[in-house]
Amino acid sequence: MDSAAPALSPALTAHTGHSATADLAIQIPKCPDPERYFYTSQCPDINHLRSLSILNRWLETELVFVGDEEDVSKLSEGELSFYRFLFAFLSAADDLVTENLGGLSGLFEQKDILHYYVEQECIEVAHSRVYNIIQLVLFHNNDQARREYVAGTINHPAIRAKVDWLEARVRECASVPEKFILMILIEGIFFAASFAAIAYLRTNNLLRVTCQSNDLISRDEAVHTTASCYIYNNYLGGHAKPPPDRVYGLFRQAVEIEIGFIRSQAPTDSHILSPAALAAIENYVRFSADRLLGLIHMKPLFSAPPPDASFPLSLMSTDKHTNFFECRSTSYAGAVVNDL
């Protein structure tokens, strides 16, 4: 993984025959920009998101998955297969996002953006570790069974459709702004249906701590997509934006793939994910696309209505109060609207 570009960007020169300490020489430009050597706020919107991320930091060790293992036995065979599949995808996709963050941060010199990406990388690590725990819960702590399942699932056509589409779009990507459109689609669309399907466990009082972690992770991703939208809008001035038809085409394709993903894997024997619930999830994916288009100052593509009050992810927007029996408060400080 590429690391975030340091403010100093020193050139390190090796000299044969000297100690390791003596081999490092820092070269400072003859006419340096003084702002490279101290912090100056240049991106107030991104700085706000960094502060929000710090305020809402959490660790996988704060979540105790007591009771979730017992709930696994309450899932039907189709439901268990479905949720194992979702978490195999989310775990793999989350690691891919982490690997790409260093490359994005290296495009900028503004410290607010660099500092923000440090925070995002840190929380993505927590996501990855939580997904590991949840996968083990779904496999009754049988690590070998989990490994064999992931090895046989990671190239499933529904997952490959997302990966192949993304790889093709990256290869043909003509500009830096288009790369940010792809990041918005990865975190804002390609996770949306999975987050919603997991949230439906809450309505059946199942896997309570898994649902708490889903609250936290989906809210984090809302911050991340907002940051990508802000950067796309405000900090890519030297790069031409892709034409509207191109952006709309990418959004339309991503939504079609995401809806196909959830349809192809939805269990047929489920009391958790009814046909009405699946229709609500599909509408939510379209609504999320329209909202993200609005964040980058474009008109909606689908004109999808917002989810109604019974949609489980909407419960995350209400104020929550920690009680004695909660393992971790999922209240989120700050006023970032969650669309995931």
From Swiss-Prot:
Q: Give the way it sits in the membrane.
A: Single-pass membrane protein
Residues binding Fe cation 2:
E124, E187, E221, H224
Molecular function (GO) terms listed? metal ion binding; ribonucleoside-diphosphate reductase activity, thioredoxin disulfide as acceptor
Q: Where are the transmembrane segments?
A: 180-200
Compartments where located:
Host membrane
Please give one Pfam family short name.
Ribonuc_red_sm
Provide the active-site residues from the annotation: Y131
The question of whether Transmembrane is a record keyword is answered with yes
Q: Which CDD domains match?
A: RNRR2
Which cofactors does this protein require? Fe cation
Enzyme Commission code: 1.17.4.1
One of the protein's GO biological processes: deoxyribonucleotide biosynthetic process
Q: Where does Fe cation 1 bind?
A: D94, E124, H127
Q: Which reaction does it catalyse?
A: a 2'-deoxyribonucleoside 5'-diphosphate + [thioredoxin]-disulfide + H2O = a ribonucleoside 5'-diphosphate + [thioredoxin]-dithiol
- Report keywords, A-Z: DNA replication, Host membrane, Iron, Membrane, Metal-binding, Oxidoreductase, Transmembrane, Transmembrane helix, Viral latency, Viral reactivation from latency
What does the sequence similarity comment in the record state about its family? Belongs to the ribonucleoside diphosphate reductase small chain family.
Subunit relationships: Heterotetramer composed of a homodimer of the large subunit (R1) and a homodimer of the small subunit (R2). Larger multisubunit protein complex are also active, composed of (R1)n(R2)n.
Function recorded in the entry: Ribonucleoside-diphosphate reductase holoenzyme provides the precursors necessary for viral DNA synthesis. Allows virus growth in non-dividing cells, as well as reactivation from latency in infected hosts. Catalyzes the biosynthesis of deoxyribonucleotides from the corresponding ribonucleotides.
Protein name stated in the entry: Ribonucleoside-diphosphate reductase small subunit
Q: Which organism is it from?
A: Human herpesvirus 1 (strain KOS) (HHV-1)
Taxonomic lineage is:
Viruses, Duplodnaviria, Heunggongvirae, Peploviricota, Herviviricetes
Tell me what gene encodes this. Answer: RIR2
